[in-house]
Amino acid sequence: MNPAYFLVLAAVCVSLLGAANIPPQPLSFYRYTEMIQCTIRGSLTYLDYMDYGCYCGTGSRGTPVDELDRCCQTHDNCYAEAEEHPKCSSLVKSPYMNLYSYTCSGGTITCNADNDECGAFICNCDRTAALCFAKAPYNEENKEIDISKRCQ
């Protein structure tokens, strides 16, 4: 086998093995993370908000540990509302699968008028949370907490 082909094949295999450990993310998650990046600008990224407090990332139970965690709780509740929304009830229009459009300019997020009813609802959920994140202080001690003890 040509060494160049072997190197390409090996690189693809290593990439696939690494990607196998990454859980699939809902389509709207990408829009949400882009919105967060639009509003927070600076050293924090959306990854800093994963596994934060009782509501940011996986979890969603108990009493929020701070203002930022309340932003995530509000976002979770908004998505729960969206799941009950008549225009978001099908698999294709699920809050987690529906893509919407928006613009970001100077930290200002605008949900586009061409979104369907479900997309507009989800866009507003994500927009509200991203703006909330921009105002809430980030407390390093609330990252990767023991949710079994602190989120009752």
Swiss-Prot record:
It comes from the Eukaryota. GO terms for cellular component: extracellular region. GO terms for biological process: arachidonate secretion; lipid catabolic process; phospholipid metabolic process. CDD domains: PLA2c. Residues 20-27 form a propeptide. InterPro entries: PLipase_A2, PLipase_A2_Asp_AS, PLipase_A2_dom, PLipase_A2_dom_sf, PLipase_A2_His_AS. Its EC number is 3.1.1.4. Keywords: Calcium, Disulfide bond, Hydrolase, Lipid degradation, Lipid metabolism, Metal-binding, Secreted, Signal. Ca(2+) binds at Y55, G57, G59, D76. The keyword Calcium applies. It catalyses: a 1,2-diacyl-sn-glycero-3-phosphocholine + H2O = a 1-acyl-sn-glycero-3-phosphocholine + a fatty acid + H(+). The keyword Secreted applies. PLA2 catalyzes the calcium-dependent hydrolysis of the 2-acyl groups in 3-sn-phosphoglycerides. Belongs to the phospholipase A2 family. Group I subfamily. D49 sub-subfamily. This is Acidic phospholipase A2 1. It comes from Bungarus candidus (Malayan krait).
